[in-house]
Amino acid sequence: MKYKTYLVTVLWGALLSLTLPGAAQNNLQHQKDSLRQVIEHSEGIDKLRSYHRLYYLYMSEIADDRKMDTLLTVFDQAEAEAIRQGNTKMQGMVYGNLIISHINRNEYDQIIQKAPAYLDFYIKHEQWRLYYQIHMQLITAYNLKGDYTHAAEEAQLMFDRAKERKDKAGMATALYATAITYNVQDRWKEEEDCFRECISLLWEVSGYDNILTQAYAFLCSSLRAQAQYDEILKLVPEYRKAIARFEKAAGREQPEAWGNLYVALMNTYIDTKDYDKAGEYLAKLDGIVNNNISKYELARARALIFQSRG
């Protein structure tokens, strides 16, 4: 399972509290101009919310360096306005979305430079959910730079702070981060143990269903690396329950979560040479519209299943 895919999917979705308004449309510039007009003529929370929507529009275009430069300016303006109004919640959101923008541009040094001050801000203002999300991004930056020592140190610090607060969600998030550090080093057994403990804690809290289903996906990947196929199959009932809980909480279907489960089962049956069952899950994957599963992985599976049938 791709480590970086998780980061974009989970943290983009979990951190941002609003959807991109009209991001799929062709009138982005018109929307930006309209929001700038609103910002100019509004005050208070309306002004901050308009900044919030404006930087979301630019975040959909951050692959463009010029748009990223503009986004950084908008972040600065939004931060200044939040400080002027004394709105620490919106100020914290600015910092979080700035870090997400850097992670999605692979700007790991920027994250390592900026995140510590933002984490101090979150601690001071007791914005713990954002604290855990952004601490995860700092750990991510170290992992993707290959600095596993600092990644592990930050994950331990994150866990200790959560444990001190008796915050099970925070402890689970820290364990997730630790497991990812093992994942990128192919330390499968240690990864497995961390994800099992993480999952156990996440079942006791609400609001982290996306991370819970991703933890199951990574756990299956770790078990596959250890050829523990029976253990993968044992996980399936509770994995399905986790996805169902996610869908109920979100109020919509979660095709990516199902896709990760189907990939785990497809690969399990391919590895154990039960190609008929593997084919069933390949068909389910083909039925998921716009799934994010690797085209190479699907092509490989299709070839192996076809070859097995002579």
Predicted regions mapped to residue ranges:
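Bacterial N-terminal signal peptides that target proteins for export
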Residues: 1-11
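Bacterial N-terminal signal peptides
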Residues: 9-19
